């Protein structure tokens, strides 16, 4: 008998625990020719803002040992174009679409959450708190528990949809941040976002990225991500989504053991567009081969 791969994630019924990560899968349609969307649990759109954003100047992507740095700058079409141009595709897909979004003030976050709450094709929301708070001198929401709590509480009041908060690893104590977000009303937490890094061109003596710094993703960050998922899983009661360097079914299952109920596949999709589907299928094979009846039986089953 085939293992049960289904997951209930904060009210979202997923056919399996594999999702795609924001910023690596467009709005879903871009990858539909390469991935059978009905073979993955859910997909997460690239980050959305109230107004369109052109993003950062180039170069804004560079390969690094074991990963990549990106400084895309949250380029996106804005909420109006998203509703007019992207939502019709979501209506044709039988897989939950989760919209990642961000703002520069708690009020902007709340306004976006309210607008997205009105769209039936949007199954859930993922809040990107790795953005500067323009009202408080540019401090990044996701590095201050009070600021993060304000954003999450504002979004919680604006929507009844499942609310996932994406945590930054660029903090002193990720557990404190996780607790603040959970206490403010997050239904689930996804972690980790990218680590801040940079690359230098020795010949020109200049940064490779026009933005100087960028977000590091890929296999290089997996050990950090695993550690943070494990730490947070021991401290909060809400379900977790593990992110960071997942390129195989084995990687994904390690995150499940560490305490994640689901995972997101990001950078791997740039290398192999069908990576998320292949990882989901590989997880099912592993469970079958090892006599595990339900993937949920492995959540937090790490033996320490």
From Swiss-Prot:
UniProt-recorded Gene Ontology molecular function terms: dihydroorotate dehydrogenase (NAD+) activity
Amino-acid positions noted as binding FMN in the UniProt annotation, renumbered to this chain: 22, 46-47, 100, 128, 166, 192, 218, 244-245, 266-267
Xref: InterPro entries: Aldolase_TIM, DHO_dehydrogenase, DHOD_1B, Dihydroorotate_DH_1, Dihydroorotate_DH_1_2, Dihydroorotate_DH_cat, Dihydroorotate_DH_CS, Dihydroorotate_DH_I
Keywords assigned: Cytoplasm, Flavoprotein, FMN, NAD, Oxidoreductase, Pyrimidine biosynthesis
Record flagged with keyword NAD: yes
NCBIfam families linked: PRK07259.1, pyrD_sub1_fam
Function field: Catalyzes the conversion of dihydroorotate to orotate with NAD(+) as electron acceptor.
Assembly and oligomerization: Heterotetramer of 2 PyrK and 2 PyrD type B subunits.
Name of the protein: Dihydroorotate dehydrogenase B (NAD(+)), catalytic subunit
Organism: Pelobacter propionicus (strain DSM 2379 / NBRC 103807 / OttBd1)
Taxonomic path: Bacteria, Pseudomonadati, Thermodesulfobacteriota, Desulfuromonadia, Desulfuromonadales
Gene that specifies this protein: pyrD
